[in-house]
């Protein structure tokens, strides 16, 4: 564990995790990435460089569908790279959308993944195309700096374009926070953009992070009540916008949320952010920096499984962390203001804003691609070519075609009709509120399918909903291929976390508003057991629910599952 005032340690404790030594000796995230990229013998890079590459917004992966066959043929794995593009608040111009579409066609697997943190993600990029892909992203005035790694990740905010003035201000704050907390190293520009090299990197400084950066990843998001679409309680720092008389006055602050855990290690668990107070809006960037530096100085650097800020808050106590924050700020944060969330989903379809329109398109699991009967990618390209507003990537992996002028609305609607694009109203409430991570075949951590499987599982659950008369009922359902929690499954009313191919832990009892953790209901079950478990529950819910009662609330009231008050009780 590191606890120093200057946060840049020349001699690291020998008990620290090996990643701390790698970061400290990486020459501010350069490592030998350039040499690895230049090696023509392999499609991979060294393991150390692969770890550092995450700070540049890319993961080395391989096609797990081909692993066994390539092993039999004595070939190395089918290596490729994922790039995650930093898009603060998920706001992109039509020109940027076209550029992302071009990159996906030229260098990736002809698809774009809209992530649960409002970023673009490309898969299947070969090593020889990695640098040009990065350059093309930069030409679009975007980047992948700090989209991954032990730093602040893409800062989220509510898309909310129909409240134009408040949203613009909130999106500006998301961008300011994201830019302020970027690493200052010149490594990204040197490696990917042929920037001028720093001759003496010993003079280089990381004024916020230091040369070992953070113990683990760090996530910040801004919610705008009544919508909790960013799942504010899942964030390391959650900011809840307080709006009075259509004016943003400040933010309530939550600390120490996080979704990830490790199967079989009960010392790891998901946790909700704790509400600690209210801050005026002009102080938000400084407050985020000071909270981040508390994690920098007191986070666990010996055990990465317990290194997230949620464990720091649990170990030191939210009162101590708040007092330390006040000390670093030089002033005291105030008591939290009143607010109320109603849901954590998206408002789909056309919504009228101030002098404009906004269309929220349902995109199942955020995968933008063309199929034989649904040319989604082609349609969005056509829209981008005529659109004069912008696009907003939603935290639920949907897409807002935003700020459509009244003059353009009919033209865009014609493209929507031509390609039969859906706002989700032809789907069940369950499917509209579904979310899945990538998992197989590219994610190296996946233990089971997720994105490729959840749609077909939902189809079978929909038969149960039809039997129960619940097809229009809004129920959140999420699936991940491993317990890292990328689709924020621990907040869903129904969730599945992969244990092995075809096997999942099933969780129930999350809140429709994203304010409560769920709890394990069945362990290591297959599809038949999933359906057999859900059928009686859905039938009971249909017959015995109270007026307006959501499924997650019902299973707790009915005694099916115990309510989780704190992440530390998640496994008990």
From Swiss-Prot:
Alphabetical UniProt keywords: 4Fe-4S, Amino-acid biosynthesis, Cysteine biosynthesis, Heme, Iron, Iron-sulfur, Metal-binding, NADP, Oxidoreductase
Pathway: Sulfur metabolism; hydrogen sulfide biosynthesis; hydrogen sulfide from sulfite (NADPH route): step 1/1
Keyword set includes Repressor: no
Pfam families assigned: NIR_SIR (PF01077), NIR_SIR_ferr (PF03460)
Residues binding [4Fe-4S] cluster: 437, 443, 482, 486
Summary of the function given for this chain in its UniProt record: Component of the sulfite reductase complex that catalyzes the 6-electron reduction of sulfite to sulfide. This is one of several activities required for the biosynthesis of L-cysteine from sulfate.
PANTHER family per UniProt: SULFITE REDUCTASE [NADPH] SUBUNIT BETA, SULFITE REDUCTASE [NADPH] SUBUNIT BETA-RELATED
Listed name of the protein: Sulfite reductase [NADPH] hemoprotein beta-component
